[in-house]
């Protein structure tokens, strides 16, 4: 069985409340293409998989949600760490991986594990 995990699924595996979306860094033109519906079919399957655990907040951009569910956005390099350690690590990461970013914040477990803003 081949599994295509996306950022949404990797966040869900943490089993914490997580709010993210607007801070998600995107490649140039990715959002424009997603607005036109140009995303892999796996993105829709991934989104359906996490849907019971996901609350999309008012004003969230559908294209960004599609991109977060894109199997190419695997969270294999997703890191969870204490808030006070995040900025120093980010500065160090950005010296050799300038696309590194803080994409969300872990909070207490809620009825919906993920919130997309």
Q: Which sequence ranges carry the predicted segments?
A:
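Glycine-/charge-enriched secondary-structure boundary and capping motifs
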Residues: 1-117
